């Protein structure tokens, strides 16, 4: 069974947009504009920017991966769904970091979610490589997870 790439892209683009929207809706606007309220507000803006960059990076990689294909296999579609499921959890942990900036659990949870999203993206890449002439660069699959694992380890060290 084959699925039209434009349908897969349309669905995925909608999910990516909803994820960023949910993250921005999690930002609490300050009730007063003194430093006690503005510092947490700017922290939430910072977390929103970081999370949006992660989502935007995955969106770019996703659109680039599917570029040039008219149809994809059902295995690619399933890997794509898992990819979106993991990314859909990103707003939850982003909000956790916004609400509890000194706690380690939301930070580690976010790192694990990004690792799982990257693993599912890698699976999607490999399913496409299995029926196309494109090669999969292993080096691109090593850099992201290593940097995320290092970031998670630094979260343990910093507490």
Write out the residue ranges for each language-model feature.
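Multi-pass alpha-helical transmembrane bundle typical of ion/small-solute transporters
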Residues: 1-159
């Amino acid at each position: 069974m084959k699925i039209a790439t434009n349908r897969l892209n349309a669905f995925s683009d909608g999910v990516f947009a909803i994820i960023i929207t949910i993250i921005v809706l999690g930002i609490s606007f300050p009730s007063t504009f003194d430093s006690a309220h503005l510092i947490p507000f700017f922290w939430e803006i910072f977390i929103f920017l970081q999370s949006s960059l992660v989502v935007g990076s995955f969106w770019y990689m996703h659109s680039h991966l599917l570029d040039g294909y008219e149809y994809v296999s059902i295995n690619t579609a399933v890997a794509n769904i898992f990819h979106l499921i993991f990314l859909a959890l990103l707003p939850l942990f982003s909000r956790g970091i916004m609400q509890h900036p000194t706690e380690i659990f939301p930070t580690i949870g976010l790192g694990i979610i990004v690792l799982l999203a990257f693993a599912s993206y890698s699976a999607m890449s490999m399913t496409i490589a299995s029926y196309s002439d494109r090669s999969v660069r292993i080096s691109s699959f090593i850099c992201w997870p290593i940097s995320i694992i290092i970031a998670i380890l630094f979260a343990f060290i910093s507490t």
